[in-house]
Amino acid sequence: YYGTYGKHVGDGMLYYFLKDRENRYLINAISCALEICENIKNLNMEWKTRKGWFRELYLNIGINEGKEYFGTIPSAPSIEFTALGDTVNYAGRLSDFARNGAIWITKNLFNKLTAEEKAGIRYGIRHKDKDRETLVENTFSRIIDMTGLNDMTASKFKDISTLAITEVVGWR
């Protein structure tokens, strides 16, 4: 998918999908995320069957689009690639917001996809009632509207509280 591994603080992973005339970098990032989630689901099933492991592995994913400043960090035995700025920070905060292996993208990213690419993605916001959850397809929400003003988690995401996002759940 033409992603480039980048240096990331903490226990997460970071990949950059760089804009190029020849590739569809945004859809590549989404495709990569969906394939990773599918592989993790398969790994979970295999471990349950083969090893009797009943814990679930999850990789929460946040994807954003924007312009950043790139650089390298020399470290033995190689050089590490890094970028700083709001785009990277928002993607990291989205992965913090995600739960149970979800993929969250910003409306900013979605709006830069072609009409054909948008039509191929299944996305939306999950609405929770008392005992069930429903995906309201083709919708976006601000983080603050999903966490509530008085929720303790709302303060954790204050810096991205007004960011419009949606959950990518698969292909159509």
Residues of each region from the PLM?
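A broad, structure-centric signal for solvent-exposed, well-ordered loop/edge residues
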Residues: 70, 77-80, 90-91, 112, ...
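Conserved, well-folded catalytic cores of nucleic-acid-processing
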Residues: 39, 43-46, 76, 90, ...
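Catalytic core of nucleotidyl cyclases, primarily class III adenylyl/guanylyl cyclases
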Residues: 1-28, 42-86
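Intrinsically disordered, glycine/charged-rich C-terminal tails and inter-domain linkers
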Residues: 100-172
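Alpha-helix boundary/capping detector
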Residues: 39, 55-56, 89, 120-121
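Catalytic/regulatory signature loops of cyclic-dinucleotide turnover enzymes
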Residues: 64-65, 86-108
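Serine endopeptidase catalytic core focused on the charge-relay Asp
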Residues: 36
